[in-house]
């Protein structure tokens, strides 16, 4: 049996979590993806498959303010922006989907900043 790569293991964890975590119009899903360089967050209504709000470190307006900061500080900034955009769209409560990543480091920093920004999960 071949050894599974870390990416394959993460995808398996994500599938396992997604069996139970569903976003609704009243309580959409806050989905996080983390790459080696960037972090992305989306607020998704799974009933219609639509993204209601999104933020990431690749956006030009965010990227300019994040130069010279650590990846954890960048994740905090993305968490604050996603909370602001979700609240502007009328979203107060979300279900957190960590995307198969450990709830530690950048993923935790993004979640804490989103909570501090007013989102409840």
Swiss-Prot record:
Write out the function statement from the record: This is one of the proteins that bind and probably mediate the attachment of the 5S RNA into the large ribosomal subunit, where it forms part of the central protuberance.
Please provide the record's keywords in A-Z order. Ribonucleoprotein, Ribosomal protein, RNA-binding, rRNA-binding
InterPro entries noted in UniProt: Ribosomal_uL18_bac-type (IPR004389), Ribosomal_uL18_bac/euk (IPR005484)
Question: What is the official name of this protein in its record?
Answer: Large ribosomal subunit protein uL18
Quaternary context: Part of the 50S ribosomal subunit; part of the 5S rRNA/L5/L18/L25 subcomplex. Contacts the 5S and 23S rRNAs.
Cytoplasm as UniProt keyword: no
Please name the source species.
Roseiflexus sp. (strain RS-1)
Give the encoding gene's name.
rplR
GO molecular function term, any single one: 5S rRNA binding
Q: Show the SUPFAM superfamilies listed in the entry.
A: Translational machinery components
May I have one GO cellular component term?
A: cytosolic large ribosomal subunit
Biological process annotations from GO: translation
Record's family? Answer: Belongs to the universal ribosomal protein uL18 family.
Return the Pfam families for the record.
Answer: Ribosomal_L18p
Cysteines engaged in disulfide bonds, as pairs: none
